UniProtKB/Swiss-Prot annotation:
Keywords: Aminoacyl-tRNA synthetase, ATP-binding, Cytoplasm, Ligase, Nucleotide-binding, Protein biosynthesis. InterPro entries: aa-tRNA-synt_IIb, aa-tRNA-synth_II, aa-tRNA-synth_II/BPL/LPL, Ser-tRNA-ligase_type_1, Ser-tRNA-synth_1_N, SerRS_1_N_sf, SerRS_core, tRNA-bd_arm. It comes from Nitratiruptor sp. (strain SB155-2). This is Serine--tRNA ligase. Consists of two distinct domains, a catalytic core and a N-terminal extension that is involved in tRNA binding. Its main location: cytoplasm. Disulfide bonds: none annotated.
Length: 414
């Protein structure tokens, strides 16, 4: 959730940054109007409370001096009633502000490039150059169907479109990749955790999926439960409503989970193949840090995911997302895009995001800093999306005879 105190101090600067993320002017105008009313009522309340303190002191002095206190007593009662009324008004305005604030995204960091969509993202660097083929490389769905690795028809029969069945070497590779990724993440200091694949509404509110993006979630009927869209949700919320006593070192977690998304906003993109599925496997990284450590940890997480792709011999690039392409909770994001020769383009395979204290404020995750309790910073990222990694291996390691070679680092996992 956005910092209402920071908003109070510098509304215009934060509002300008939010506009670059696509927040409509009328929403910001409504927020500003409500905020001005809140500040006015809060000032009146503070003045009434100050007056009450002065009257109370005067009342005590009058009693000690034997003066008539009836008029003063009456004034105290009247002022007390005004305080109660204004407290109710302030509470009501705070609730309205909170409800609006829950639907407003995290303002982008000042160094994030301003832009409207993915066309304005900035390529930072390329790791490994795409190799040339002496034949026309095929796309993963064609390879998968010919080899009997991917069964799209039976996926639809079992569920609906955007589901698939992995068979033969593809099923074994999926399992091998999960184990390989978890082992790799452990080398970077991430502790493996097994979490529930469902989450309640408070958990999804904490990481920002609710209330705004409920349409993209699969809800369990008659239960306050949803299928998780990413392991970021349970991993981050492990510390919801907690004060971490010792956060000298960042808490670094990794987990494998299936992920479930309706893809309500996909607009019919990537209907064919496995790029965009309702259910897909992913290995996630989450870090919980002191504010002053989050930039360093962000860089470490990017390095962790990138080195995983490099171990697999997969050409990829680092892309800084512009303000208009940032996710709801992210203040800064670097995408890793892997080269798919069959498609002849780079596709996202990992997003590493620093949410600063945005999720921590929603989930009330704090740490003990001397005598004070401070909000943590939370970070998350894929290391990696397993299905897309499988796709990348199929397309980059395809042979002229239609077979697919296996990266050497995976041989011991098969």
């Amino acid at each position: 959730m956005i910092d209402l105190r920071a908003l109070e101090k510098d509304f215009d600067t934060i509002a300008t940054r939010l506009q670059t993320k696509g927040v409509e002017e009328k929403v910001l105008a409504e927020l500003k109007e409500l905020f001005e009313e809140y500040k006015k009522e809060k000032t009146i309340l503070q003045e009434l409370q100050t007056k009450q303190n002065s009257l109370s002191k005067m009342f005590g002095q009058y009693k000690r001096e034997g003066k008539d206190i009836n008029e003063l007593k009456n004034e105290l009662e009247i002022n007390k009633g005004k305080i109660a009324a204004h407290q109710e008004v302030v509470r009501d305005l705070e609730e309205k502000l909170k409800n609006i604030a829950l639907t407003i995204p995290n303002p982008p960091d000042p160094d994030v490039p301003v832009g409207e969509n993915e066309e304005d993202n900035v390529v930072l660097k390329t790791v490994l150059e795409p190799k040339g083929f002496d034949f026309e490389p095929k796309e993963h769905w064609e390879l998968g169907e010919k080899l009997g690795w991917i069964d799209f028809e039976r996926g639809v029969k079992l569920a609906k479109s955007r589901f698939s069945v992995l068979k033969k070497e593809a099923a074994r590779l999926e399992r091998a990749l999960i184990n390989f990724m978890l082992d790799h993440n452990k080398e970077y200091g991430f502790e493996e955790v097994c979490v529930p694949f469902m989450a309640n509404s408070a958990t999804l509110l904490g990481t920002g999926q609710l209330p705004k993006f409920e349409e993209d979630l699969f809800k369990i009927c008659d239960e306050d439960l949803y299928m998780i869209p990413t392991a970021e949700v349970p991993l981050t919320n492990l510390y919801r409503d907690e004060i971490i006593k010792d956060l000298e070192d960042p808490i670094k977690l990794t987990a494998y989970t299936p992920c479930f998304r309706k893809e309500a906003g996909s607009g019919g993109r990537d209907v064919r193949g496995m790029i965009r599925q309702h259910q897909f496997d992913k290995v996630e990284l989450v870090a919980i840090t002191r504010p002053e450590e989050s930039d360093k940890v962000f860089d470490e997480m990017v390095k962790c995911a990138s080195s995983l792709l490099a171990k697999l011999g997969l050409p990829h690039r680092h892309v800084m997302l512009c303000t208009g392409d940032l996710g709801f909770s992210a203040a800064k994001t670097i995408d890793l895009e892997v080269w798919l020769p069959g498609q002849g383009k780079y596709r996202e395979i990992s997003s590493i995001s620093n949410t600063r204290d945005f999720q921590a404020r929603r989930a009330q995750i704090r740490f003990k800093d001397g005598k004070k309790n401070r909000l943590v910073h939370t970070l998350n990222g894929s290391s990696l999306a397993v299905g897309r990694t499988l796709i990348a291996i199929m397309e980059n390691y395809q042979q002229k005879d239609g077979s697919i070679a296996i990266p050497k680092v995976l041989e011991s996992y098969l």
